[in-house]
């Protein structure tokens, strides 16, 4: 059905023509976060990857100055977005097993995990944009660590 409707072509054309190339991997990441959270599964990677790769290729074709790092950053956005949703969703097997193992309610466990996961997801968006702009992996990881450390120092509490 998706093939006959041309959903992939529609999404590729929509994102490749309307979004600034600097934000495409971050958009892919956020979309994957939403899909995996709603589905409660890593399966979103299989749903989004067939769209993310053509989107990345179309954007690279439309913007000749983009480096070869662009496609791997888009793929990383899909993978990390899928992991985010699988970690946060109250419907995923990981959350259910962790709640059962700790003896707490599944929703209570999911709600306690969300502030941490959303914080890291927001930092990840900055790091994805940094990687999209061509900064090295070492710089991008250091940026993420420094931002997370600053958040801990500013908002963290001593037990």
Where are these regions (language model features)?
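Loop-to-transmembrane alpha-helix initiation sites
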Residues: 69-73, 136-144
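Helix-loop-helix connectors at the membrane interface of multi-pass transporters/channels
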Residues: 17, 52-62, 95-108
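Membrane-interface helix termini and inter-helical loops of multi-pass transporters
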Residues: 3-17
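Alpha-helical membrane segments and immediately flanking helix-loop junctions
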Residues: 73-114
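Interfacial segments of transmembrane alpha-helices in multi-pass membrane proteins
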Residues: 37-45, 131-140
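Hydrophobic core segments of alpha-helical transmembrane domains in multi-pass membrane transport
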Residues: 1, 28-36, 53-55, 78-82, ...
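Loop-to-transmembrane-helix entry motif
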Residues: 14, 18-22, 91, 112-117
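Hydrophobic alpha-helical transmembrane segments of multi-pass integral membrane proteins
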Residues: 19-59, 63, 71, 78, ...
């Amino acid at each position: 059905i998706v093939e006959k409707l041309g959903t992939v072509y529609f999404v590729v054309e929509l994102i490749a023509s309307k979004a600034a190339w600097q934000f495409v991997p971050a958009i892919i990441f956020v979309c994957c976060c939403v899909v995996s959270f709603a589905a409660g599964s890593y399966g979103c990677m299989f749903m989004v990857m067939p769209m993310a790769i053509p989107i990345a290729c179309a954007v690279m074709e439309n913007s000749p100055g983009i480096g070869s790092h662009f496609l791997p950053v888009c793929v990383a956005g899909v993978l990390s977005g899928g992991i985010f949703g699988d970690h946060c969703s109250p419907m995923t097997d990981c959350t259910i097993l962790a709640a059962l193992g700790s003896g707490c309610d599944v929703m209570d466990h999911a709600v306690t995990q969300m502030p941490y996961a959303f914080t890291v997801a927001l930092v990840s968006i900055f790091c994805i944009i940094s990687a999209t702009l061509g900064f090295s992996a070492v710089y991008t990881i250091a940026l993420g660590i420094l931002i997370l450390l600053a958040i801990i120092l500013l908002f963290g509490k001593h037990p």
